[in-house]
Amino acid sequence: MEPCRSLALFAGSLGLTSSLIALTTDFWIVATGPHFSAHSGLWPTSQETQVAGYIHVTQSFCILAVLWGLVSVSFLILSCIPALSAPGRGPLVSTVMAFSAALSILVAMAVYTSMRWSQTPFSQVQTFFSWSFYLGWVSFILFLFAGCLSLGAHCRTRRAEYETL
């Protein structure tokens, strides 16, 4: 297996794992006050609270990014097995899906970041982004790497020429 394909598979797997962890954990925001500390994520625990629209947008695009990342990694795995892959098409599909995952997670993170920054802070409470939030941005970078490396793997694959058919 060529190095671009194996590195793309590694970066895509890390991107998929980090986006799944970021999506499911509750440490996107941490709030500290004089006598308390609290954290929250994308999934509210109380049924009575009204969820803001930007949270729904972030949830939706994060889920899309996970799905695109899963398809990308699956096609990279299939491209490593010659009997299961179409000649030269696995890395190309993986490239498109990895870039789609990167775009989806970028939209999710940009919406969440812009809406959290525009909220007015309370005087006694300090809020800041936590590790789940930063893991979402890391998954964006990893999906970009996976897309670029998959594109490199696609460009380096040998295609059947007319004479060999």
Curated annotation (Swiss-Prot):
Which key words tag this protein in UniProt? Cell membrane, Cytolysis, Inflammatory response, Lysosome, Membrane, Transmembrane, Transmembrane helix
Query: What induces or represses expression of this protein, per its UniProt record?
Result: Up-regulated in CD4(+)T-cells in the liver and spleen upon infection with Leishmania donovani.
Q: Which InterPro entries match?
A: PMP-22/EMP/MP20-like (IPR050579), PMP22/EMP/MP20/Claudin (IPR004031), PMP22_EMP_MP20 (IPR004032)
Q: Please provide the Gene Ontology terms (biological process) for this protein.
A: CD4-positive, alpha-beta T cell activation; defense response to protozoan; granzyme-mediated programmed cell death signaling pathway; inflammatory response; killing of cells of another organism; natural killer cell degranulation; natural killer cell mediated cytotoxicity; natural killer cell mediated cytotoxicity directed against tumor cell target
PROSITE patterns reported for this sequence: PMP22_2 (PS01222)
Q: Where this protein primarily resides, as one coarse class?
A: membrane
Its biological function?
Regulates cytotoxic granule exocytosis in effector lymphocytes, thus acting as a critical mediator of inflammation in a broad range of infectious and non-infectious diseases. Essential for cytotoxic degranulation of natural killer (NK) cells and CD8(+) T-cells and for the activation of CD4(+) T-cells following infection. Plays a critical role in CD8(+) T-cell and NK cell-mediated cytolysis of target cells and contributes to the cytolytic activity via the perforin/granzyme pathway by enhancing exocytosis of LAMP1-carrying lytic granules.
Q: How would you describe this protein's topology in the membrane?
A: Multi-pass membrane protein
Q: Name one GO cellular component term.
A: cytolytic granule membrane
- Compartments, record wording: Cell membrane; Cytolytic granule membrane
Q: What is this protein called?
A: Protein NKG7
State the tissue distribution.
Answer: Predominantly expressed by leukocytes with cytotoxic activity such as CD8(+) T-cells and natural killer cells.
Pfam name, any one:
PMP22_Claudin
Q: What transmembrane ranges does the database entry give? A: 9-29, 61-81, 92-112, 133-153
| Annotated knockout phenotype | Cytotoxic activity of natural killer cells and CD8(+) T-cells are defective in knockout mice. Mice fail to resolve Leishmania donovani infection, which is accompanied by a sustained reduction in the production of pro-inflammatory cytokines and a defective CD4(+) T-cell response. Mice infected with Plasmodium berghei ANKA show a significant reduction in the recruitment of parasite-specific cytotoxic CD8(+) T cells to the brain, along with lower levels of inflammation.
Q: Which organism is it from?
A: Mus musculus
Q: Which domain of life is it from?
A: Eukaryota
Belongs to which family?
A: Belongs to the PMP-22/EMP/MP20 family.
